[in-house]
């Protein structure tokens, strides 16, 4: 079993100011978005100009941050924030939801498209291939922080990793499983899936490869966005089987996690949209 390397979450600290790895992962994601966006403009595969891409980035950042935070509040810890509403603004303490961020970006795309006279689906198709590497960057940020670890796996698995931050979850799991209790006593930690890296590979690298390559030629309007939607939903649904369920929610109906249930409509809409738009002529 490998022990998580325990990175310092603060990259640089100057007086009261601190630059955190997790914040840097978001910044890197936005840089990658801009870089890939400019490549697509040069290839003639974008509805953006260089100027409008930079303008949209501001809208997108607001959508990610506001949507991600509100999504986390509503989907995961609503009762806690209802009791302490001012904690909603403590974004430095963590707590972001991809599904909320996704909805925030969709709203930003709709508003931006209305302002600039760009069709919603055409804009979605343009944005979709630029997103997955940013998701990959965010998962690396999760790994560096030692958060969102995976479920318990076999002690002899070469990929097994112990997370010191999971002490409470380790104790709780060991209390219900004699073998795990033995492992915990012997090794001090339980072997877990490094699910952040699985999500990095699936939702980040694999999704990027699929959507980027598919969108290298003109496709029917809406099909690229549908591929991203369904692809993310499928990859996230799979990765959630290795990820530790949120301690304040656990597993829900049918033994699925909140992340899986939120991914189901993405999968359905993505598949239906991909087939439906694919039956139309390119325009």
UniProtKB/Swiss-Prot annotation:
InterPro entries: Lgt
Pfam families per UniProt: LGT
Biological processes, Gene Ontology terms: lipoprotein biosynthetic process
Keywords in alphabetical order: Cell inner membrane, Cell membrane, Membrane, Transferase, Transmembrane, Transmembrane helix
Ribosomal protein found in the keyword field: no
Residues holding a 1,2-diacyl-sn-glycero-3-phospho-(1'-sn-glycerol): 139
Location in or out of the cell: Cell inner membrane
Entry EC number(s): 2.5.1.145
Signal peptide: none
Gene Ontology terms: cellular component: plasma membrane
Top EC class of this enzyme: transferase
Molecular function GO terms recorded: phosphatidylglycerol-prolipoprotein diacylglyceryl transferase activity
The protein's role, per its UniProt record: Catalyzes the transfer of the diacylglyceryl group from phosphatidylglycerol to the sulfhydryl group of the N-terminal cysteine of a prolipoprotein, the first step in the formation of mature lipoproteins.
Record family assignment: Belongs to the Lgt family.
Name the record gives this protein: Phosphatidylglycerol--prolipoprotein diacylglyceryl transferase
Biological source species: Neisseria meningitidis serogroup A / serotype 4A (strain DSM 15465 / Z2491)
């Amino acid at each position: 079993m490998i022990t998580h390397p325990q990175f310092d979450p603060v990259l640089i600290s100057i007086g009261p100011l601190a630059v955190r790895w997790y914040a840097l992962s978001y910044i890197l994601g936005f840089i990658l978005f801009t870089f890939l966006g400019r490549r697509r403009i040069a290839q003639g595969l974008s509805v953006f100009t260089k100027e409008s891409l930079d303008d949209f980035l501001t809208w997108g950042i607001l959508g990610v941050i506001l949507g991600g935070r509100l999504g986390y509040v509503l989907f995961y810890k609503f009762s806690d924030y209802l009791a302490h509403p001012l904690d909603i603004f403590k974004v430095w303490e963590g707590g972001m939801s991809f599904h909320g961020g996704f909805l925030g970006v969709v709203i930003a795309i709709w508003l931006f498209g209305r302002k600039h006279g760009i069709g919603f689906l055409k804009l979605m198709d343009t944005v979709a291939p630029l997103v997955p590497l940013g998701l990959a960057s965010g998962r690396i940020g999760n790994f560096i922080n030692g958060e969102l670890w995976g479920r318990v796996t076999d002690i002899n698995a070469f990929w097994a990793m112990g997370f010191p931050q999971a002490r409470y979850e380790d104790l709780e799991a060991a209390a219900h499983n004699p073998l795990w209790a033995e492992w915990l006593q012997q090794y001090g930690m339980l072997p877990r899936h490094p699910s952040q890296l699985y999500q990095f590979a699936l939702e980040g690298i694999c999704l990027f490869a699929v959507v980027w390559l598919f969108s290298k030629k003109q496709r029917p309007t809406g099909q690229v966005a549908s591929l991203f939607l369904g692809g993310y939903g499928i990859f996230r649904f799979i990765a959630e089987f290795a990820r530790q369920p949120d301690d304040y929610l656990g597993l829900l109906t049918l033994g699925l996690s909140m992340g899986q249930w939120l991914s189901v409509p993405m999968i359905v809409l993505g598949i239906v949209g991909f087939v439906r738009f694919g039956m139309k002529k390119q325009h």
